[in-house]
Amino acid sequence: MKKFAFLFCAVAAVLFLAACESSPKGYSVVDGVIVFDAPARAEGQHSVLRLTTDPMPVVRVGFIGLGMRGPGAVERFTYLDGVEIKALCDLYPDRVEKSQEILAGRNLPAAAAYSGEEGWKELCRRDDIDLVYICTPWQLHVPMAVYAMEHGKHVAVEVPAAMSLEECWQLVNTAEKTQRHCMMLENCVYDFFELTTLNMACLLYTSPSPRDRS
């Protein structure tokens, strides 16, 4: 199994490099990191790829969307230290109540409750929330994430974060203008195979070729 995994990663890395070599150059290597070309940014707008924020002893979270993945996310957060669940929101009030029961079952205080079509905006406008966690239908991800960032909140959004290239850039531009984190919650990006393949590709691409070593 380990041999198969290694071969799989090696082949994937080679294919990745071949694709890079065969395509028009749209990247550069800076300090061993492949940096892809990107459109010019508006004045005062800066990349958030290496954005850092001041440490937060307690991260205050508000959840939007409690129908399918939302309740599971709420429950997982109840097991985390340094987290306070401050607000819960869904179109339907009964879903909010069910998530309140999750908090009660963990002996945690009830969160502020929001419902209806505009409740999520009220949640985003609160001044005691650091992170907005979005678990709503796909077409609502971008408008909610943008609104939250524009109101000073960091954002975690379920997959897919956006439904078009234009929407992707809308998220990027808003994150850069507001200097707020916007993370798509795709855990497979950080799995063993993906990270191993990426590291192998970077290592192969940035290491001297056998010809250069001689």
Regions found by a protein language model. Name each.
Residues 174-179, 196-204:
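Basic phosphate/pyrophosphate-binding loop/patch that engages nucleotide-derived ligands
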Residues 8-16:
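Bacterial N-terminal signal peptides
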Residues 205-212:
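Conserved small/polar residues in nucleotide/adenosyl-binding loops
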Residues 137-138, 142-190:
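Beta-strand-loop-alpha-helix segment that lines the small-molecule cofactor/substrate pocket
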Residues 111-129:
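A structured beta-alpha segment of the ubiquitous adenosine-cofactor-binding alpha/beta core
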Residues 1-4:
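Positively charged n-region of N-terminal signal peptides that target proteins for export
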